């Protein structure tokens, strides 16, 4: 099972990815985690990423795609993976399609969690309160100003990725405003179809 979960910040991608990871016994691949691991491991692509990150730059699409390509070759990803935080742009989506084609792999599903942006801020604020109440640390970007920036960036750069996958005929949508178990059930239904 190879899949991508799309949706704006606060849509529940992390929650659903975690559930899918446990249910399908496949890794959840976060580009941020992969970048840090590649840098730590000193891989050729990790060294390129480190040079860019140390200089304060944004890691290029080519480097990110290279890190994803390396990661999906690891033994735990042989039976599939869930991409989390990637692709973020149409250019990355196109590069991923090319890379998977070269590896003779296909995506089984691209699922977008569709949510009401106005309700997302309330969801983010609730998550922050629950995290604090549980004694955890609130994400630095779980505040109204940062959230607005994140949602604007999503709208501008990442939302077009949905249109790209729709044009490929692989995009499925799920109502991300439903409760967590209902969203999980809707995703399961798509994956079993």
Curated annotation (Swiss-Prot):
| Domain comment as written in the entry | Consists of three domains, a large central CORE domain and two small peripheral domains, NMPbind and LID, which undergo movements during catalysis. The LID domain closes over the site of phosphoryl transfer upon ATP binding. Assembling and dissambling the active center during each catalytic cycle provides an effective means to prevent ATP hydrolysis.
The record ties this protein, via PANTHER family, to: NUCLEOTIDE KINASE
Report keywords, A-Z.
ATP-binding, Cytoplasm, Kinase, Nucleotide biosynthesis, Nucleotide-binding, Transferase
Q: What name has this protein been given in UniProt?
A: Adenylate kinase
Q: Which domain of life is it from?
A: Bacteria
Pfam assignment, any one = ADK
Cited InterPro entries? Adenyl_kin_sub (IPR006259), Adenylat/UMP-CMP_kin (IPR000850), Adenylat_kinase_CS (IPR033690), P-loop_NTPase (IPR027417)
- Residues annotated as signal peptide: none
Region ranges (LID): 126-142
Q: Which pathway does it serve? A: Purine metabolism; AMP biosynthesis via salvage pathway; AMP from ADP: step 1/1
Q: Give yes or no: UniProt keyword Electron transport.
A: no
Catalytic function, reaction form: AMP + ATP = 2 ADP
> Which EC number(s) are documented for this chain?
2.7.4.3
A biological process from GO: AMP salvage
Instruction: List the record's Gene Ontology CC terms alphabetically.
Output: cytoplasm
| Span list, region NMP | 30-59
Where ATP binds, per the record, is at 10-15, 127, 178
Q: What residues does AMP bind to?
A: 31, 36, 57-59, 85-88, 92, 139, 150
User: What CDD domains does the record point to?
Assistant: ADK
What the protein does? Catalyzes the reversible transfer of the terminal phosphate group between ATP and AMP. Plays an important role in cellular energy homeostasis and in adenine nucleotide metabolism.
- What organism is this sequence from? Beijerinckia indica subsp. indica (strain ATCC 9039 / DSM 1715 / NCIMB 8712)
Provide the protein's localization.
Cytoplasm
- Major place of localization? cytoplasm
**Annotated family:** Belongs to the adenylate kinase family.
- Summary of subunit composition and partner proteins: Monomer.
| Alphabetized GO MF terms | adenylate kinase activity; ATP binding
């Amino acid at each position: 099972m190879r899949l991508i979960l799309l949706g704006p910040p606060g849509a529940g991608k992390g929650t659903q990815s975690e559930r899918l990871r446990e249910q399908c016994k496949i890794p959840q691949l976060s580009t941020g985690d992969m970048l840090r691991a590649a840098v730590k491991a000193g891989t050729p692509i990790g060294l390129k990423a480190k040079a860019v990150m140390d200089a304060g730059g944004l890691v290029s699409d080519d480097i990110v795609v290279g890190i994803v390509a390396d990661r999906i070759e690891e033994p735990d990803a042989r039976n599939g993976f869930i991409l989390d935080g990637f692709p973020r742009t149409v250019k990355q989506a196109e590069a991923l399609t090319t890379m998977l084609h070269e590896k003779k792999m296909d995506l089984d599903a691209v699922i977008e969690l569709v949510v009401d942006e106005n309700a997302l801020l309330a969801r983010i604020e609730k998550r922050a309160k629950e995290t604090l109440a549980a004694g955890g640390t609130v994400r630095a970007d779980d505040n109204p100003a940062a959230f607005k920036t994140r949602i604007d960036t999503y709208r501008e750069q990442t939302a077009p990725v949905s249109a790209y996958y729709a044009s490929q005929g692989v995009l499925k949508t799920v109502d991300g405003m439903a409760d967590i178990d209902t969203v999980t059930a809707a995703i399961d239904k798509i994956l079993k179809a």
